[in-house]
């Protein structure tokens, strides 16, 4: 059974994500200790809240270089909500530098008639990487649950794995590149499809463990 480390940096309730991963057949460990993250088979970076405090909490725990090294190592990595946004270089929400893993910035939705900010509730995904393993056994345009006022804007459009449209604004809802996957929506709140995403991630971790190192 693979061990997945869920990074604890005081930015949200981690219980739901852990429960979903455990139901998918994995053991989870919630930790902010670098040695736990490095020794795990995969890492999940969840989070809700604001960009600057998130980066400050990671820095105070000396986790920024640890996360960067884990991503460079090829270990499966899943970011959720704020855990997607802080992978980028910075945010209009604050002044702190992000992790800088993905070139691009985090922007705020523009006000327009007929929409609410934050973007809150159920909305449909449009796949940009339809063959991504994270989407296995899933409908063509699944409904998922969002709660956010900011969205990621990657420089390289090929990292986009899915988009969503709020009013007239179509924004990035998920990214994927090599071992890194991250979603703006909350899988743990997205009913059957969300649990399937977590199960697919666990399946990828198991496949990685079964593949001999070159």
Curated annotation (Swiss-Prot):
GO terms for biological process: L-histidine biosynthetic process. GO terms for molecular function: glutaminase activity; imidazoleglycerol-phosphate synthase activity; lyase activity. IGPS catalyzes the conversion of PRFAR and glutamine to IGP, AICAR and glutamate. The HisH subunit catalyzes the hydrolysis of glutamine to glutamate and ammonia as part of the synthesis of IGP and AICAR. The resulting ammonia molecule is channeled to the active site of HisF. Keywords: Amino-acid biosynthesis, Cytoplasm, Glutamine amidotransferase, Histidine biosynthesis, Hydrolase, Lyase. It comes from Acaryochloris marina (strain MBIC 11017). One of its GO terms (cellular component) is cytoplasm. It is found in: Cytoplasm. Its EC number is 4.3.2.10, 3.5.1.2. HAMAP family: HisH. Residues 3-211 form the Glutamine amidotransferase type-1 domain. Its main location: cytoplasm. This is Imidazole glycerol phosphate synthase subunit HisH. Heterodimer of HisH and HisF. It catalyses: 5-[(5-phospho-1-deoxy-D-ribulos-1-ylimino)methylamino]-1-(5-phospho-beta-D-ribosyl)imidazole-4-carboxamide + L-glutamine = D-erythro-1-(imidazol-4-yl)glycerol 3-phosphate + 5-amino-1-(5-phospho-beta-D-ribosyl)imidazole-4-carboxamide + L-glutamate + H(+); L-glutamine + H2O = L-glutamate + NH4(+).
